[in-house]
Regions:
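Active-site/substrate-binding loop(s) of hydrolase catalytic cores
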Residues: 57-58, 71-205, 209
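Short glycine- and acidic-rich boundary segments immediately preceding or forming the N-terminal edge
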Residues: 5-47
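Active-site-adjacent mobile loop/cap segments within catalytic or ligand-binding domains
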Residues: 186-197, 214-265
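Short beta-strand-to-loop junctions in surface cap/lid or active-site-entrance loops
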Residues: 47-56
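Active-site metal-binding loops of divalent metal-dependent hydrolases
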Residues: 66, 102-104, 181, 234-237
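Short, Gly/Ser/Thr-enriched beta-strand-loop segments that form substrate-interacting elements
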Residues: 35-38, 205-215
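Short beta-strand element of the alpha/beta-hydrolase
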Residues: 57-67
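Conserved beta-strand scaffold positions in the cores of enzyme catalytic domains, especially
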Residues: 33-34, 48, 98, 176, ...
Length: 265
């Protein structure tokens, strides 16, 4: 149904470099993105990168560009792949899995758009409890049927959200880091474990828990599935923070993981 007129790129770097801020071809190629069986609505490959040193004690899933017009989120995921390849001074051995662009159709659209090719906000399409009731009411009453926030006809109606759920089931992360823009804050959804403290800041971004939305990844992962979800809202959609700032955010994340995440082997 969906492939007409669309030429699938054999490797993503030409398209990513042309579209993403602060991403040159050597950086993208060094990320060594691997194709998956996952496809977008328009048939684009969903790419991942695994960094697994072996004998990992913690698994962390990093997701960028759930919203296709938040270009900086995919850029920072690619920058962080480079950092994840360096040995880290921390007690955990981490298996990282990066999905830099969950919504490539929105990202590579001209102009880029928040929703996927079906017009669905992927971050409202995850199967949170009472989705059928709450997501529709929230969209109609709170957003006044904003088309940029349409949750879809049913939970997991979209191939991209189904792919992410399947990745979560396969990978079983102990932490999910979801990168967005442009609110310039840090959000956290997590299990109500006593003593579990979210990160207070990453770089210049400070914790400001913005609430729970029906169908969001934070609600699904953090509240429903009990997997902590750190949501990074970069300050700008079309520009990344400075390289030193992205590195500081990375180091702050590692420090928090060292203090708060429990190894499960």
């Amino acid at each position: 149904c969906c492939m007409a007129g669309f030429a699938q790129s054999a490797e993503p770097c030409d398209e990513f470099v042309a579209r993403l801020p602060n991403v040159k071809k050597p950086l993208c190629e060094a990320a060594k993105l691997q194709p998956t069986a996952g496809r977008s609505v328009n048939g684009r490959t969903l790419w991942v990168r695994d960094i697994n040193p072996g004998n990992a004690t913690v698994r962390v899933l990093v997701v960028g560009a759930i919203h296709g017009d938040e270009l900086s989120s995919a850029s920072m995921a690619l920058q962080w792949i480079r950092m994840a390849e360096q040995p880290a001074d921390m007690p955990h051995v981490v298996h990282w899995r990066f999905i830099p662009a969950l919504n490539p159709d929105g990202l590579l659209n001209k102009p880029p758009k928040r929703v996927n090719a079906n017009g669905v906000d992927l971050n409202r399409n995850f199967p949170t409890p009472n989705w059928e009731r709450d997501a529709k009411i929230y969209w109609e009453k709170r957003t006044r049927k904003d088309p940029r926030r349409f949750p879809g006809p049913k939970p997991l109606s979209e191939p991209e959200s189904r792919f992410l759920i399947e990745e979560m089931q396969r990978f079983k992360p102990q932490l999910i880091v979801s990168i967005h823009a442009p609110y310039g804050v840090l959000d956290f959804d997590g299990p109500a474990k006593e003593g579990f403290v979210p990160p207070s800041k990453l770089g210049r971004l400070y914790l400001d828990q913005v609430g729970i939305f029906p169908g969001s990844l934070g609600n699904y992962g953090g509240v429903h599935k009990g997997v902590p979800v750190v949501t990074i809202e970069l300050p700008k959609s079309t520009r990344t923070p400075l390289d030193a700032e992205m590195r500081q955010m990375w180091l702050d994340l590692l420090r928090w993981m060292s203090e708060r995440l429990r190894s499960e082997g």
